[in-house]
Amino acid sequence: MVRVLLAGLPRSGTSWAAEALSHTSEVTYVDEPDGFRDAFAFRVMMQYGENPALTPNEVAPEYERLWAGAFAGGRPPSGPKARLAQRAYLSVETSVRQNARAGSGVAPALRIAQRLAQPPTADPNARHVLVKSVQCARSLDWIQQRFQPQIVILLRNPLNALASWRDLGFVGNPSERADLANEAQQRWGVSAPHAEAPRLAHQAFTFGALTESLLSTAEEHPEWIVVRHEVLCEDAPNRFRALAGQLGLTWTEHAETFVRDSDREGQGYATKRVAGEQPQRWRQRLSDDDVEVIRGVLAQFPRGSVSDC
């Protein structure tokens, strides 16, 4: 079995890349098992945070159950408890879930979801498993040590990613911001923007801190594959075919068709975009002031590649 973890930050092109690779031969695709759509992931986030920071030797049984199920094929759990948990989780508004993760009180339905939620389960037919995550930047070493997946890190120009973060209102959890601020100060001597700073400055800080975590961990693992979204866009069919080969996955006509068909207009969470337009898309979406705010924040981080990625 080939196990692959495709990791990146939100709006970095991970959905497009993962879907392309999911069309290679005999691949079971598990989409964000640690994300915001599942009751067990919510249970995990309530314990470890939205972006868990775990050292390799740290004991985290619930997080381990989540990833064990994901790398075994990631089937949704069956049984009455799991179904009730998911139903309870989805019965409340997104804002109610956000408030719970931020420590502002847990609604009764979410308490039920937490108590009854079950992790993903094995798929006995899974030959190769591809897992995509945008929440594991601070736990990659922990995941690597336990499950030994091949790891692909996808980076994107922060100006493009942050244009999407701004439009979609990302980074709304004050407890997560405080946690990242403490880590950035302790590890890199980088201070978070002051409370009255523009929202975009706080978004850029979160992007910088999480990207710094990705890159600093990747530097210790030369066997990991680091890919830039802009490079994939240059010649998507050939770039993805080469990436699949590096991972030991067999490229298929379905994969080729998906990549070519996705090269057209799209917006929001859709995976369709005109690939050649994406590297410079930020120029149409950000003002000069926006760019100055982003670059000013990212310039504080020690790796020049953070402001350049």
Indicate where each model-derived feature is located.
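PAPS-dependent sulfotransferases, especially Golgi type II membrane carbohydrate sulfotransferases
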Residues: 1-5, 10, 52, 56, ...
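PAPS-dependent sulfation machinery
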Residues: 32-129, 175-193
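Short catalytic/ligand-binding loop motif for oxyanion handling, primarily in non-cytosolic enzymes
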Residues: 15-18, 37-39, 137-140, 160-164, ...
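Short His-Asn-centered micro-motif
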Residues: 7-8, 130-134, 155-156, 229
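Hydrophobic/aromatic beta-strand patches that form the interior of the parallel beta-sheet core
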Residues: 4, 28, 150-153, 225-227
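Conserved phosphate-donor/acceptor-positioning beta-strand/loop module used by diverse small-molecule
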Residues: 132-133, 143-168
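A conserved segment at the C-terminal end of the G1
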Residues: 15-27
